[in-house]
């Protein structure tokens, strides 16, 4: 694999992690508003 492939894999991984973190924070905010 060349550097571009490695970079792409890293970007894809961090993108998925970021999406998960955003989903979790949104869910937590929704839970707070429900109380």
Swiss-Prot record:
Main location: plastid
Keyword Transit peptide: no
Annotated control of activity: Light regulated via thioredoxin by reversible oxidation/reduction of sulfhydryl/disulfide groups.
Pathway, per record: Carbohydrate biosynthesis; Calvin cycle
An individual GO BP term: reductive pentose-phosphate cycle
Family label: Belongs to the phosphoribulokinase family.
Name used for this protein in its record: Phosphoribulokinase
Origin species: Pinus pinaster
